[in-house]
Amino acid sequence: MSQTAYRTHHATEVTEALVGQKVTLAGWVDRRRDHGGVAFIDLRDSTGLVQVVIYDEDMARPLRSEFVIQITGEVRLRPDGNENTHLATGKIEVVAETIEILAKSDALPFQVSTALENESENKLPGEDVRLKYRYLDLRRPSMQYNLKLRSDMAKAARHALEDMDFTEVETPTFIKSTPEGARDFVVPARLVPGSWYALPQSPQLLKQLLMVSGVERYYQLARCYRDEDFRADRQPEFTQLDMEMAYVDQEDVMAMTEKVIAAIWKSAGYEVQLPLPRITWKDAMDKYGSDKPDLRFGNPLVELTEYFKNTPFRVFQAPYVGAVVFKGGAATPRRQFDAWQDWARQRGAKGLAYVVFGENGELKGPVAKNLSDEERNGLREAVGAEEGDAVFFAAGSRESAQLLLGAVRVELASREGLLDPKKFAFTWVVDFPLFKPTDDPDDDDVAVGHSKWTSMHHPFTMPSKDWIDKFDKDPEHAMSDSYDIVCNGEEMGGGSVRIHRDDIQARVLDVLGITKEEADEKFGFLLEAFKYGAPPHAGLALGWDRTVSILAGADSIRDVIAFPKAGGGRDPLTGAPAPISDEQRAETGVDYDPDADEN
């Protein structure tokens, strides 16, 4: 790093090679220790720590934690036995000759010292306090690491894409409101009273227009905005690595994305084996109860619908019956099984049926007595359990029961310590349905259109080749050319082949119940562009915050965003959202009443 007006070196640049030389350093007082008239200070900057020794008591006396100081001194080796192998600078120290206090610090609301970062007694405050004082929270080494990692990942992605002849293009932030599956954030247009801009949920339509424009390979780190109900690990504003290509198919986009992912992970010291595995959406749901399966561990779901087809147990007289094995679960106390019932009810289920295989294969549990002798005798083999295991069941509609069992599978793995954050299990999920029922959207998705069907991904997704001629005749079974990239049970990103023909787009919109007039009003500019020669195109977007959090091993995406929002979109740091003044309301026209003009 280059020399500046305040320093000759950063902390971790002070090595044994500089012994006997003078250096000037600048940073925060991380920690101070006094030993018999000699003060030791750990000086912290963005690179790490270096130990400073102060023999002058008058020089050391005013220094406190988080004071910003500049020191000049001579580098020397630490005395034998005083080396710190945990520090990059652990073999040397700097003997201070002069110290200047550049800024003082009040007592901190919580400690940010590197020395306390990994100590159990260093209890961080609640997240609202951390976010209110985010500038202090970001001083912690783990947060500095996350921000640097995010930057390095972006650099690696850019290099990989530019090596593949992609062009970075910035798209507008003020656009027209278009249906994309969530609510828009809107901004009043002061110069056009009564009219509003929308902040983009994604650059979807704009990047398709770039394909029509002749930009054959586009990317950007795009800011996106979605006005969603609060969910634990979502943000109202987020970043995605957006990529689109012309004259390509699904295989081309997947191959390109794999190269980008490999480059990103390599920047952090990991090798990703290519090509990545694939699983169909149906197999993912059947085997793992999730369209974003965590493949760091096994224990797939077992379908028992056929096994229980003649069961006397009414609960299992359902369209779908499935199970997941709880290894060693027979030793679980009854109260813990009761807690599992509460866990299931919190997820909207009525409960969680179970049996245990005791000694000598004896079947126990509340479900056991309801099964026939034949069902009891063959159950252990049917589910692949062993003596000492337990088995959880779910019955009902296929999707709801599989989702519950999939959640059980992951919860079991979590409790068994199988979710290693440094193990990365990638997979593509392919062959998604084109549509899903409007009354069954994921979480708080807003259904696009006015029919019984809405888009599984978005309304601009191309039907698969086998379905192009008939998707509107059988929407329930129609399949799409779409694909998601999943890692460790998290959806990192998703993409699809896009519709580039106005006749196919019109048929998809018709299935969604979007009239021609509404389509022209919402996104007629895209349909108009298709009339002038739109090349086949496809793309994918990686959720950047999620991708960084996976590689960082962070508990939340908020830990890899510099200034995230808290629950409900609140910003404890700045106080946003906040009321605006009456003058601002009048200027922006948020209360504009067109009828008032007529009067």
From Swiss-Prot:
Catalytic reaction(s) noted: tRNA(Asx) + L-aspartate + ATP = L-aspartyl-tRNA(Asx) + AMP + diphosphate
Gene3D superfamilies: Bira Bifunctional Protein, Domain 2 (3.30.930.10), GAD-like domain (3.30.1360.30), Nucleic acid-binding proteins (2.40.50.140)
Extent of Acidic residues compositional bias: 590-599
Site features described as Important for tRNA non-discrimination, chain residue numbers: H35, G81
Primary location group: cytoplasm
UniProt-listed Enzyme Commission number(s): 6.1.1.23
One GO cellular component, as annotated: cytoplasm
Subcellular location: Cytoplasm
Cited InterPro entries: Aa-tRNA-synt_II (IPR004364), aa-tRNA-synth_II (IPR006195), aa-tRNA-synth_II/BPL/LPL (IPR045864), Asp-tRNA-ligase_1 (IPR004524), Asp-tRNA-ligase_1_N (IPR047089), Asp/Asn-tRNA-synth_IIb (IPR002312), AspRS_core (IPR047090), GAD-like_sf (IPR004115)
Spans annotated as Disordered: 565-599
GO molecular function: aspartate-tRNA ligase activity; aspartate-tRNA(Asn) ligase activity; ATP binding; nucleic acid binding
Residues engaged in binding L-aspartate: E180, R226, H457, R498
Role according to the record: Aspartyl-tRNA synthetase with relaxed tRNA specificity since it is able to aspartylate not only its cognate tRNA(Asp) but also tRNA(Asn). Reaction proceeds in two steps: L-aspartate is first activated by ATP to form Asp-AMP and then transferred to the acceptor end of tRNA(Asp/Asn).
Family: Belongs to the class-II aminoacyl-tRNA synthetase family. Type 1 subfamily.
UniProt protein name: Aspartate--tRNA(Asp/Asn) ligase
Organism encoding this protein: Bifidobacterium longum (strain NCC 2705)
Gene transcribed to yield this protein: aspS
